[in-house]
Amino acid sequence: MTADTHEVAVARLREAYAALPAGTPVRLAKPTSNLFRFRDVGPKGPDGPAAQLDVSAFGHVLRVDPVRRTAWAGGMTTYENLADATLRYGLMPTVVPQLKTITLGGAITGLGIESTSLRNGLPHESVTEMEILTGDGRVLRATADNEHADLFRGFPNSYGTLGYALSLTIDLEPVQPFVHLRHFPFGSAEACMDAIGQIAANGSFRGHRADFVDGTAFTPDELYLTVGAFSDVAPWRSDYTGQHIYYQSVRRDKEDFLTIRDYLWRWDTDWFWCSSGISTSWATNSRDGSWRRAFIASVKP
């Protein structure tokens, strides 16, 4: 999609929104959802379920600028597609939420977090401009210093109450081909939190640079911090896209190596923290995890 075709899509969406009867509840027409909560199909208006806006035209990466280290993408662009587009240039979004089907707009208006957040905060902190469809049908370009600065500051984590993000411009950061992981065990949450404090203060842990940090708690007295660092070389590369499950390696291996792309999606194959809750932990996994991902992604909370 080009800038011109994007503008055409914006105009068509505005027309579709304007054609809705006043007071009609609205929701986005999306093939998948990553909302981890129960909800009614509604909200329901006086004549039935909410109207659905077709936003499929806003799921494209519009531009990657490797010199300025920025990307311009539609709000419905999945992080998988966004990461693939930026990794070609040796760049990635400053925060990449852990599931491939999470969208850029969803992570901004919802709440996205990942293992670079200790350095880079939340996804919205990399946004420099947003194009937002508001409740009164306007499309506004909001930045930190223009006339819509209040909307720019208030939109993150507003869960769709202020409008829908049609496109966003975000900052990117450089990457290296591999990530070197080290898994550190802890016997209590207190000890684990103390270690996180050290990493936040020093940017490293036990002499190892901390480009990525996340934690896994198996029991109250068995916790692990995984500290990752970019690397140009890897003596081996693990593969967790099939039957080998990443979370099991956390307590088994002291260190590991992944390609940067495989690292970004290390949790995506089985979503272990929620799969048993929706009866998918028994599922036979395909080579690339697509069967299970498709099944889970089709479950609408």
Segments predicted by a language model, with ranges:
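Noncatalytic alpha-helical scaffold of FAD-dependent oxidoreductases
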Residues: 1-301
